[in-house]
Amino acid sequence: MAQDQNVPLVATSPPRKRRRPPKSCDPCRRRKVRCDRKFPCGQCERARTALQCNYAPIVTASSPSGGDISHLAAPSVREGDSPPSEPADPQRPSRPSAHSSHLLPPEQHQSQNKIIQNLQRRIRRLEDQLPYPATSRTTTGPDSDVSQAQALRHLHDRVLLTEEQWSDFSQPNNLVNGWAIPAIQPRLRVTPDKTKVFGPSHWLHTAEKFQVLGKFDAKEVEPSLQGVDSRSEVAGILKDCRHLRQTMKAQESVRLNHPVPDILSTLPTQEVCDSLVDAYLRTFELIYRIVHIPTFWEDYRRFWTQPQSTSTHFLMQLVLILALGTIFYSDRSKRVNLRRLAHTWIYAAQWWLVGPSEKSTVNLEGLQVGCLLLLARQTNILPTTSWLSVGSVLRMAMVMGLHRAPDLFPALSEYQSEMRVRLWVTVLELTLLSSLDASMPLPFSLQDIDCMAPSNLDDEQFGPKTERLPRPQPSERLTESSIQILLHKSLPVRVEAVRLLNNQHRQELSYETALRLGTELRSACRDVAALFDTARNQSRHVTPSSKMAPFHLRFIDTYLRRYILFLHRPFMIQARKDPRFYLSRKVCLDSCVVIASYADHLRLPSDNLDDLSHLAIVGRGSFKGALSFDVIISLGLEIITQLEEEASTRPSGSSPPFVADHLDKMAKANRVPLIRSLEHIQEQLLQIIALGNPSLKRYNFLCAILSQIRAMESGQPIQPAIYATIKESLLKCYTLLKASHAASSPQESVESLTTGPDSLPDFDVDALDPALGLEIPSLLFFPGLMDMSGTEW
């Protein structure tokens, strides 16, 4: 009976109709648009959602074969999303069977390979973010010659294991201070004219949870017409709204005349431009990595064949590079005119960067122009507030997300990632430089930065079309990035040094900390010497290391020793009355002697100058090198301190000439090289004034220092000697400036004086009589003590 009841139930039940399997991909089915059934389909490619294109598997009665992987689910992890905390759904749609990959056209097969590589990189990023080493890391990734079926199977295994580990990790942990959740990862928007990062507190991370908005694309957050049927009514309305919006914004914008409407007409001949570009690339570019050299040369050659079709951002890069190249141009007959043109180019680039087109410059090209602009203003005798300007460039870089690790943004190409890292390190270096020179706090914290160091690669090893960066060279192999990597190694120490020096709320300056940082910076100087020693040893080979020049060694050595000088200078001053800090006197003296020695190559009025000498003539702040005020006053103070110590050992009431014992004679002999170094700097500063550069403070102050030293050595009254010296030095300055101004027309002048050519007043040297009660600081033009705002220091 039971058998009679059971058999008919199965035999008589009507056959269940099987649902027709879908042929369109899942995104097209959701959007209800026609799918061309390719992989990825045309609709998904136009909507920039190629990675989300997937097809439902065709379920058959037989079990899948070894090569069929259509039953596997490969969930997509979008950029910036938290990893899924739930296990993979076995009913979730997946990619088409890998059996069909060999039947696809070559371009589609290549597209699938790119998708697999992209997924591998994104899964690797998820594994790296695990709080403990992922088990899947021990599994070697598939080689490039394996089938797509094997590659996808390998990815499937890694996805399942990573999801399981993330699921365990994403469960709230009962911590001491409460409950914790995974940090929200940033999102990056990259469009042709703008790059922007969306931080953890941005509304985007909440808005994307609304299903009505759908999934945001990794590259473009705003709605796009590419995801809407252009024949629909919605698409037409959206087009009209966007067009009207752009029209209204154009009407409201202020139309200003460009200060240099035809910048192409200001460029010199191609031969001169070639020389200027080469001068920049052989000097600054190897220290501050800004451009990709092969790409720049390609654009540069294209510019001379099709100048009218050149993009504006490349034109701005070019004119700033030319402006930086004028520093090292040796032809004096053309140098004056090129310097004037350099000022024109700098103002034009600044207008483009922060003028009406400011919003469209927030991208890598705009940031490159910003970095070049900072360097150009620092080296062309232009009035500048570098600390304010570099703060804007720093914030621009952070808005673009350069301070975050590129691995967080898998939509970036390998070329973009590496260039972002290089540019970010350059921005940090320029920011650190400006804070040190301006004696202001740093506007960033290393705790907010997780960007890695640049790769040790030559520019020829990768480019915009590179899909995968080659393996970085060993550290002992010198490349075009070796100098930047070496500077990046000492970056944390220098950041701590600037924070210690410019801490606005400190009560005390720790001597132990200063000693520790000074020792680490001294070690960094040795690393620099070792790097260039390696470069010299490898110079017999045809390698990029041959591009390293003495300019780079002297520039970086001067730069690092300034940190040592600044760290110990407060204790050097204190050591004049507290001998416990005598070591700081010695450290400051050693640093100044090394820096001042680099001025030996500066031999004005000769034209045979090296690159560092050319830079010292026109540079600002740290770029003045041996001619900086810091070196002058530190050396002068050490000599005067030694003379004061000698005077304190003489019997009271003794009068000149003083009797010198053997120790006094040895001390005087040791001071002779220091005094000669200051006298050489004094002569070079006077020659710079003769070139038409109205930089007066350093020269006149050094004249006063040397006058005091001579008076103390001879036992003569100090104040009358200083007044007489200042009278003579000011008269020299006035004579040289007047001659330089008369010889230059307004169109040819490098720096015109504030008064007209016929309105220069006569200089009354008798006004400098000490009986008039004028203070020496006032005679030396110190700010706040005398109104000399029109004079350039």
UniProtKB/Swiss-Prot annotation:
<dbReference type="Pfam" id="PF00172">
    <property type="entry name" value="Zn_clus"/>
</dbReference>
<keyword id="KW-0862">Zinc</keyword>
<dbReference type="InterPro" id="IPR051430">
    <property type="entry name" value="Fungal_TF_Env_Response"/>
</dbReference>
<dbReference type="GO" id="GO:0006351">
    <property type="term" value="P:DNA-templated transcription"/>
</dbReference>
<protein>
    <recommendedName>
        <fullName>Transcription factor opdR</fullName>
    </recommendedName>
</protein>
<dbReference type="GO" id="GO:0001228">
    <property type="term" value="F:DNA-binding transcription activator activity, RNA polymerase II-specific"/>
</dbReference>
<dbReference type="GO" id="GO:0008270">
    <property type="term" value="F:zinc ion binding"/>
</dbReference>
<keyword id="KW-0805">Transcription regulation</keyword>
<dbReference type="GO" id="GO:0005634">
    <property type="term" value="C:nucleus"/>
</dbReference>
<keyword id="KW-0238">DNA-binding</keyword>
<dbReference type="Pfam" id="PF04082">
    <property type="entry name" value="Fungal_trans"/>
</dbReference>
<dbReference type="InterPro" id="IPR007219">
    <property type="entry name" value="Transcription_factor_dom_fun"/>
</dbReference>
<dbReference type="InterPro" id="IPR001138">
    <property type="entry name" value="Zn2Cys6_DnaBD"/>
</dbReference>
<keyword id="KW-0804">Transcription</keyword>
<feature type="region of interest" description="Disordered">
    <location>
        <begin position="1"/>
        <end position="29"/>
    </location>
</feature>
<dbReference type="InterPro" id="IPR036864">
    <property type="entry name" value="Zn2-C6_fun-type_DNA-bd_sf"/>
</dbReference>
<feature type="DNA-binding region" description="Zn(2)-C6 fungal-type">
    <location>
        <begin position="25"/>
        <end position="53"/>
    </location>
</feature>
<keyword id="KW-0539">Nucleus</keyword>
<feature type="region of interest" description="Disordered">
    <location>
        <begin position="60"/>
        <end position="113"/>
    </location>
</feature>
<comment type="function">
    <text>Transcription factor; part of the gene cluster that mediates the biosynthesis of oxopyrrolidines, polyketide-amino acid hybrid compounds with feature structures of tetramic acid.</text>
</comment>
<dbReference type="GO" id="GO:0000978">
    <property type="term" value="F:RNA polymerase II cis-regulatory region sequence-specific DNA binding"/>
</dbReference>
<feature type="region of interest" description="Disordered">
    <location>
        <begin position="457"/>
        <end position="476"/>
    </location>
</feature>
<keyword id="KW-0479">Metal-binding</keyword>
